[in-house]
Amino acid sequence: MPLNIPLRKKILAGEPAAGGWLTLPSTAIARTIASTKNVSWVLIDGEHGLINESHFYDLANVIAASGASPLVRVPAEEVWLIKRALDSGAHGLMVPMANSAEIVRKVVQATKYPPHGIRGYGPMFTHATGQLGGSYKDSANEDLLIAVQIEHPNAVKEIEDIVKEDIDIAFIGPFDLAVSMGVEFGGVEHEAAISKILDACKKAGKVAAIFCLTGEQAAKRFAQGFDMVSVTTDIDTLTDGFAAALQAATGQSNAFTAAGSGYSL
C-alpha cells in the first residue's frame, strides 16, 4: 500500500505547499503548527534547531496525526543520520549543503532500500507514514520525499546536474547561499542565483522550494513560481509575537527582540 504522504499528494496536484519550521523539541508547538489550516508540511530541524534524533519519532507522529507531512532535516549527509531520520516515520528527508551531484547521489543511495540504494532494513517505528515492516518497505523507495538544499555557489554551478538525480525537491537555503557567495542577501547576484535554481527545477520537473521567515516573503516567492515555501519558524513567531506585545505594553523595544530570532542577516 502507498504511504500516507500528504505533501506528495499536494505536489502531484500542482498546488502550492506552505509549511512551517520547527526548531524547538516540543510536541505541543509541533501540533499547533501542523494543525493550522493550510499547512502542508512541517520541517523538523535537526541541523540548526535544538532537536536531536531522540525527538524525531514523537515529533513526526504528532505532525502526521495533525494532517501535515513531517520532514526531517539532518545535520549532514551521513548514512546513519539519514537512516535514523527515516526510521522515525518522517515523510521526507532534507539534507543541507548538497554542493555537488556526487553528494546528491550518495543521499539518494542512503535513502532507498536495495536494490536501488543501501538503506538498512528496520522499519519498526514508521507509524507516521501509515505503514510498518514489509508494507512500508514496498512503498518507501517510491513515496518518501528527498529534498536537498542548494545553498552554496558550487551547488548553483552544478544545479542542472543535481536536478537530474532521483530527488523530489531542490530547497534553497537563501541565508547560507548569500553568506557562501559573499554577496548581499536579496541583492542582484543573490537573486540571480535563486532564479537560476528555480529555472533549473522547472525544466527538470522538480519541486522548487525556498526558506522564508515571513508570510510576506513567502507570498513573493510563490508569485515568483516556487512550489514549496516555508512561511516562518517557531522561534521567530514566538520572539516577534512576544516582542510586539511587550512593545505595545511598555512603549519600548530592545536590541535583542528587535533582532528577531537571530536567523536574519
Language-model segments: residues:
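Catalytic cores of alpha/beta
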Residues: A30-S35, E77-H91, V95, S100-R105, ...
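Conserved anion-binding
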Residues: W80, G92-D166, P174, V179, ...
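Conserved, mostly hydrophobic/aromatic
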Residues: G20, D45, L93, V107, ...
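Alpha-helix-loop-beta-strand connector modules within alpha/beta enzyme cores
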Residues: E53-V79, K83-D87, Q109-G117, D138-E142, ...
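N-terminal amphipathic alpha-helix/helix-capping segment at the start of soluble metabolic enzymes
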Residues: M1-T23, A128-E142, S195-K196, K202-K203, ...
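Conserved N-terminal beta1-alpha1 strand-loop-helix module at the mouth
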Residues: M1-P70, V74-E77, Q109, I146, ...
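Hydrophobic faces of well-ordered beta-strands that scaffold small-molecule active sites
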Residues: P16-L22, V42-I44, P70-R73, L93-V95, ...
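Extended, intrinsically disordered, low-complexity segments
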Residues: T233-T237, G241-L265
